[in-house]
């Protein structure tokens, strides 16, 4: 995870501050790829502080892909490393979906998954036309049934249980 901008995380050299150190990130990914039997993925922001250029991000993505990372999740906001809280970093930096699309266009061999600000199924469908996938966080945290709505919209023939049916099943587990 190369996306968290919190001070505590930065102090320990984790999260979004690592976007500034592509060689170190590539070394870490290479080591994980060499020592793991599962795919190694990276989730990152599209930039940091005043750096939000296609050239920088594309070079970063290429460097980590050369190290063995074949799936990159891009949070479509830059990380402001000083002056904003992690919560503010989820809202104040503007979303830049076209940057993610451009990275996908330039890296056809990589799986590029878009993250950030996705709140409805229309957005998901739009993003899926330009990226390999989407990652949704807060919208599902706030409304877990959103997953059922997505399933119904994307896979139209799927039978989705109602909230009442889900609650009945949950009661069985609680017992």
Predicted features by range, described:
Residues 2-14, 22-111:
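Alpha/beta enzyme core
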Residues 5, 14-15, 136, 146:
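Glycine-rich, flexible loop/turn motifs
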Residues 19:
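Aromatic- and acidic-residue-enriched carbohydrate-binding clefts of CAZyme catalytic domains
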Residues 35-39, 50, 54-71, 98-114, ...:
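Alpha/beta catalytic cores of nucleotide-metabolism and tRNA/nucleoside-modifying enzymes
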């Amino acid at each position: 995870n190369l996306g968290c901008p919190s001070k505590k995380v930065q102090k320990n050299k984790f999260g979004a501050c690592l976007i500034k150190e592509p060689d170190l990130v590539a070394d870490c990914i290479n080591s994980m790829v060499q020592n793991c039997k599962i795919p190694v993925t990276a989730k990152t922001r599209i930039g940091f502080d005043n750096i939000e250029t296609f050239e920088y991000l594309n070079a970063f993505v290429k460097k980590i892909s050369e190290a063995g990372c074949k799936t990159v999740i891009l949070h479509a906001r830059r990380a402001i490393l000083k002056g904003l809280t992690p919560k503010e970093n989820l809202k104040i930096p503007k979303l830049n979906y076209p940057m993610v699309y451009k990275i996908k266009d330039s890296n056809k061999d990589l799986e590029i998954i878009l993250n950030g600000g996705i709140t409805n199924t229309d957005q998901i469908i739009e993003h899926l036309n330009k990226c390999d996938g989407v990652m949704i966080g807060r919208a599902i945290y706030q409304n877990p049934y959103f997953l059922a709505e997505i399933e119904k919209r994307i896979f139209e023939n799927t039978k989705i249980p109602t909230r009442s049916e889900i609650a009945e099943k949950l009661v069985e587990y609680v017992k």
